Amino acid sequence: SKAKEHFGISYLRPYQELVIRHILEAEENEVESNLLVCLPTGSGKSICFMLPSLIIKKKTIIIYPLLSLMKDQENRFRNAGIPAITLKGGMDKDILSFEINRFLSEEASVLITNPEMLLYLIESNRIKKAQGNISMMIIDEAHTSIVWGESFRESFLKLPDIIDYLQPKHISAYTATMDKRIESGIIKLIFKSTTPYII
């Protein structure tokens, strides 16, 4: 199996199987899917979106709040043999252009970034070719979009604009921290008040 070959795991945990099957069945049936997944840190949630991105073989965007998480995830994808790029603020202009082109072509299928960079790419018209061509959009640590968006990271409150622009087919929000306020905030912000499939 691909899980064994690329990630060195012999079996999927029940919740991993549930998430992965939900995404793959939606893809197979050519329908959109919305997922809100609450799993504790260290529970193997990355497999939930890494394996589908490997199987579907279409473009995936993963949004992270922290640079350290972005680098970690890029290494995981690369170790699994999945071509991934990371775009963040402060990059050399030539390197940024080179990496954007890798993602827009067939060279890299996964973009790991943050809301600020995506807003910059949209406003500067540099990611227009990806419009309507994004299979999966993953928002990891989704609780931060509510907690931080209300205080010092207003870019998180523009996630609906990013989603509207890029038109991803499958949207998944992951968090390890979710009370009723956070849950309703995520549903309102990311899923525009349409109740997602909650795991």
Labelled PLM ranges:
Residues D161-Y165, H170, T177-I199:
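Interdomain hinge/linker at the junction between the two RecA-like core domains of SF2 helicases
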Residues N29-L51, Y174, M178:
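Walker A/P-loop
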Residues A26-V37, K58-T60, A108-S109, K169-H170:
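Pre-Walker A (Motif I) flank of P-loop NTPase domains
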